[in-house]
Amino acid sequence: MCGIVGYIGKRDVAPLLLEGLQRLEYRGYDSAGIVITSPKSTGLKMVKAKGRVRDLEARVPKRFAGTTGIAHTRWATHGAPSDENAHPHLSADNKVAIVHNGIIDNASELRAKLVADGVVFLSETDTEVLTHLIARSQAETLEEKVRQTLKLIEGTYGIAVMHADFADRIVVARNGSPVVLGIGEKEMFVASDVAALVAHTRQVVTLDDGEMATLKADDFRTYTTEGSTTTATPTTVEWEAESYDMGGHDTYMHKEISEQPEAVDRVLRGRIDDRFSTVHLGGLNLDAREARGIRRVKILGCGTSYHAGLIGAGLIESLARIPADAEPASEFRYRNPVVDPDTLYVAVSQSGETYDVLAAVQELKRKGARVLGVVNVVGSAIAREADGGTYVHAGPEVCVVSTKCFTNTVVAFALLALHLGRIRDLSVSDGKRIIEGLRKLPGQISEILETEDEIKKLAAEYADAKSMMFIGRVRGYPVALEASLKLKEISYIHAEAYPASELKHGPLALIEPALPTVAIVPNDDLLEKNRAALEEIKARSGRILAVAHREQEKADHTIVVPKNEDELDPILMGIPLQLLAYHMALALGRDIDKPRNLAKSVTVE
């Protein structure tokens, strides 16, 4: 993986592809490459570079003309970052070029057979295997060459293929890794993400797993990997190209943190029903009888989405009185879980394409489970695979680390919990209480954002820490987990999160002045328990930064946040910790939008 972009038409292709790669930079990558041709060309022309897209652009010669091309940003899975391992990959006769997201599971076996037949490999990647297999196919058409090759491989892929002898087309295919077609006026685009397309077209077709497409300048057709024709109905992308710009901010992360009041307002808009103190979530495909029959809720996600799911599980238990828990999707799918028909499964993913979550959804569907999706991207794989769901309406999130999407996902869970609760036993007065709390959120988030200068000063005091501990109790624990993840993702400071109740069971051994502790201390029924934890840390000379609703005398510093309903407090307590991580990383000179070794959308195992 990580980013694919392609074009066929009449325009000069290299600038279009480089622009597309720049719009995909947020996904994370370590190298980039481009290959082009045209109907009048005698072959393929390729340039690759380890590093950033700007490094690739610097290598592209001035005379590099063509009207058809594919390009790629790579995030290493097989082989270290290098010019040789960067995509595209060319066949030995320089006729076949391919870019690929995904992992070929049987690449080693296929590679050994090709080497035995005399094929010389120039890279360590699994992708190069595909290139040689396509080149060696005796099929008469490029489509059939690709189909024959796909029958030989095991694994996941999103690919785009060019051939010097078929310069009038690009062939693409999908299995487990996103491929989106962009439909223009006598021109066609392909990408792994609509971000690369929206500057040129809003009409898109998202391929399903097991589907292929042939793109020509003036038309396209879709079909299965078995050769059967499929029907492709274009949809309109709602996001504008400007949504992917920084809008005057120094980083995408800062922009996205600052957008949270508007983002939360957007996820609430049109969903609240004051008459009955409930909410309407039209895409759930879950009627009242089915909702009353739910005996358990299991939430699946990865990383930040998993943390949002932990808060969501607490909201569902509290408001709907249904037993609920959350689990990393990457663990769930490998432990042969018992799938209960009375359990509602909820899959959470910002992109809607996260491989481990998607694989868990597909396994659940095979076993007859009911699955809802909570995603940000309309038309994504999880949205299509699930029985129903809700969109979080955060808008495009470009920074690799998630901020506004995390917040909106938790708000979406609050809406889901309220919806289920009012169908079951939640009172009108409690429904009204939660609705009033939800309506306060945008204004309260704005209040927190206005304290950024104070948080920036605190960040400077803690930026020299080599390690940090985050603690919280019950609702506060997932906030601690997410804050810990944010800090390690962008500052590279080691951080751990523990339930505050577990301090005596091991973590107290770590407490010393050099290890700051960030404590989540809401003004709820556990306030005194949390204060006792601060006492234990202070007794061992630990430094404490508290996030609380009022100053904490045992803390060295306190970030004070507005009080909402107890159930909704985690949403607000996470916001200042996003800013803390941001400014600590900034003080350390980190590449905040593109942290090392990370990708925005993890579409491989």
Where would I find each of the regions flagged by the language model?
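Conserved short alpha-helical segments that host acidic/polar catalytic motifs at enzyme active sites
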Residues: 1-246, 250-251, 259-296, 334, ...
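A SIS-like phosphosugar-recognition module
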Residues: 165-166, 177, 204-248, 252-256, ...
